[in-house]
Amino acid sequence: MVKVAYVQMNPQILEPDKNYSKAEKLIKEASKQGAQLVVLPELFDTGYNFETREEVFEIAQKIPEGETTTFLMDVARDTGVYIVAGTAEKDGDVLYNSAVVVGPRGFIGKYRKIHLFYREKFFFEPGDLGFRVFDLGFMKVGVMICFDWFFPESARTLALKGADVIAHPANLVMPYAPRAMPIRALENKVYTVTADRVGEERGLKFIGKSLIASPKAEVLSMASETEEEVGVAEIDLYLVRNKRINDLNDIFKDRREEYYFR
């Protein structure tokens, strides 16, 4: 059995040092509860509701050379956990809404958000790395960010690439994802870990309700709408590595791709 966790927090806009301190405390709390994988919200270090692209460019960092990735690697080394966390990435003059994956031995990889939501299109470029699955040794973790959930192809692609767990850093403002993510878990026979934020930022209110969902569409843990907190759940990887739903049906082998896009 493996334990996974979400960190639900209220990042302060353009205050990375304060956000590092808060995140470290909550990651350590999850680690004390036995979590081996901890997922943080989208843009956990920078805040979300930017006013200008220049504002984002000033605070965004390189991956993995930047301060945020270094901070996460240090915490992962100190706690022995694996971390998936959302951050603003600077690559030359280009900005991405990204997630980094780190572990006790350092940097593992990154994902760049493919489906940008609303005003994010003013600041970031769509991701160009594809949907990625990272092998942690004891399990495989796929990553998607916030609005990616709205497109079922996102979770399906990660599942087809072998993800046991889908890590889902988010800054949710619409109410639908907490209802939809158990279905994403069910239809792909994976676990999902959605780490949302709370609070209000420059007039934009976030819904909280971070959750862990099972391949049976069970909600194993759900956070409140307002509080900073950690949620931990034990998961059974056997359930996600067997894609059969009965003796005659396998959700991947029964796919009829030749009819899906006509």
Swiss-Prot record:
Top-level taxonomic group: Archaea
UniProt record similarity statement: Belongs to the carbon-nitrogen hydrolase superfamily.
Protein name: Nitrilase
Keywords: Hydrolase
Function: Nitrilase that hydrolyzes preferentially aliphatic nitriles like malononitrile and fumaronitrile in vitro. These dinitriles are converted to the corresponding monoacid mononitriles, showing the enzyme is regioselective. Cannot hydrolyze compounds with a nitrile group bound to an aromatic ring or amino acid. Its biological role is unknown.
Location of the CN hydrolase domain: 2-237
Binding site for substrate: 173-174
Active site location: 42, 113, 146
Disulfides per UniProt: none
